[in-house]
Amino acid sequence: TQHANLVNNYYKPGPTTDLLRDRRCYRIARIGIYGQNYDNGEGFEPFKGIWGRFYIDGNYMFGNADVTADNWTDGVYAQQEDNDGNDYTWESEGKSVINNGSQVVDVKGVTTHTAEAAYEQVLKYVGACNYRDTYDKFIMDEVAERKATCNIQGSNHKLGYINHPSELVGIVEGVDENGYPVLVQVADNDLADTDGDGIPDYWETQYGLNKDYAADGNLKTVDENGEYTNLEMYLNSLVQDIMDKCREGGTVVE
């Protein structure tokens, strides 16, 4: 990343990080460059040797009041040093130019919370589905309580690392012998989809669509701005209440 805003993030190192006892325990970011020896295709050539500009502010480091109060000194500057990877230009150039002092990316329409508030919102609402299964709940509890229940010994295993669901058999409730959640199937007559376009009949009727016309799922008539398909609008409606709650208490960047 050449330019980025890193604002109001909540860092909570886990129990394994405690064992490191090094600067990774309080790292906000380790900023580097593509050095002249970096070889990953011609597309990277224009970016070699160029230090980016960053706006880093308001980030919270769990258990470290100094880094929370001052993100840069230990959280960023102390994380890097002159080395072959940055062409030994950190001290002579990088360290003095990466702190932009103000936003480097123009952001509009983004809801922002304080780091502490964002952390609470994530624990409540993060996820890729409109409900949480037994694993979602397990992970959220691990984060909230700062636990590392999984502790399988062996190569490539570390405290709290989960390499396969089977490692949690007997630890997480509601999973099968392979460690996968047992999902309950529920028949719902309201989810009839006559035309098979992925949108239930009840929703098509509610929003003036034709339940016998499959092609309208790909039209953009429901979105007043004409940007999202009707199918996308239906899918978003399944989690609209969650999205609304995510934004509560935040400030919209104009």
Task: List each language-model region with its residue ranges.
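Extracellular calcium-associated, cysteine-rich motifs in secreted modular proteins
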Residues: 175-254
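Short, well-ordered loop/turn and helix-capping segments at boundaries between secondary-structure elements
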Residues: 11-16, 61-65, 145, 205, ...
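Glycine- and acidic/polar-rich repeat regions and solenoidal domains
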Residues: 1-104
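Extracellular/surface-exposed low-complexity segments
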Residues: 69-186, 190
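Short, well-ordered coil↔helix boundary/capping segments
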Residues: 46-53, 129, 133, 190-194, ...
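A generic "cationic amphipathic patch" detector
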Residues: 19-22, 72, 152, 216-217, ...
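Intrinsically disordered or highly flexible coil/loop and linker segments, enriched in small
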Residues: 65, 148-153, 240-244, 248
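Long, contiguous hydrophobic alpha-helical segments, chiefly transmembrane helices and signal peptides
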Residues: 1-11, 139, 143, 199, ...
